[in-house]
């Protein structure tokens, strides 16, 4: 006897009641459940029923705090995430994604980004700064701490509001190799850059903090020079203003 398939709306009703931490386990049941568990509408509906939970960071620890208000006696559960030696010195917590913690390390020379996964495995990342390219695409700048070499990548196609990032293709736009180039620190809010490619060639402008007064580094068609006493920079946005 062939088993009867549940109606899609009933399957959705079952999945959205599953605790968020356990929802990913149901992705391997079948293709339909895998697609359904990734649906943004179901995810938002599922999270709306989840107990409040937030991250608390102190100088030396990071805690996960959950609040259960559904019982007669509300409870607060505090869980030490036990990073141990990963949090030596000063760190900034940028956020979490799929159980991974994104931190910025101020302790080591030059700073740096790191990702700590649920198994407490740490991976250091190269410096990266995100910007807009041609008004409808993204560009990303990454820099090596050892050589200070800069590589700039841009998305090949336009970025739409409905894109989820799975089909985005990145191509290398420009490489800058100068040992005297300043380190780009993404923790500083005034670090910005702009790239363009037109009839005059490829252009690159970087504004970043230095020990001296802030300067704009400019590269146009292979020529690099520094312009001092720069105080602001304009970077186009993907957001359309009506």
Swiss-Prot record:
Pfam families: F-box, FBA_1. Residues 1-46 form the F-box domain. Disulfide bonds: none annotated. This is Putative F-box protein At5g37040. InterPro entries: F-box-assoc_dom_typ1, F-box-assoc_interact_dom, F-box-like_dom_sf, F-box_dom.
């Amino acid at each position: 006897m062939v088993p009867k398939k549940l109606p899609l709306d009933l399957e959705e009703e079952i999945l959205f009641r599953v605790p968020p931490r356990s929802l990913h386990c149901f992705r391997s049941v079948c293709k339909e459940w895998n697609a359904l568990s990734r649906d943004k509408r179901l995810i938002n509906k599922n999270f709306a029923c989840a107990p409040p939970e937030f991250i608390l960071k102190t100088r030396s620890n990071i805690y996960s705090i959950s609040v259960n208000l559904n019982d007669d006696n509300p409870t607060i559960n505090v869980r030490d995430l036990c990073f141990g030696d990963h949090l030596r010195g000063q760190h900034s917590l940028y956020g979490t994604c799929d159980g991974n913690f994104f931190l910025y390390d101020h302790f080591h020379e030059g700073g740096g980004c790191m990702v700590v996964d649920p198994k407490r495995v740490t991976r250091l990342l190269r410096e990266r700064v995100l910007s807009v390219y041609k008004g409808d695409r993204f560009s990303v700048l990454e820099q090596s701490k050892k050589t200070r070499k800069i590589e700039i990548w841009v998305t090949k196609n336009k970025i739409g509001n409905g894109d989820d990032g799975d089909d985005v293709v990145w191509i290398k736009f420009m490489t800058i190799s100068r040992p005297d180039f300043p380190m780009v620190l993404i923790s500083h809010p005034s670090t910005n850059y702009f790239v363009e490619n037109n009839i005059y060639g490829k252009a690159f402008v970087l504004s970043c903090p230095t020990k001296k007064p802030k300067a704009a580094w400019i590269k146009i068609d292979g020529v690099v020079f520094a312009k001092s006493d720069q105080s602001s920079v304009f970077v186009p946005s993907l957001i359309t203003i009506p």
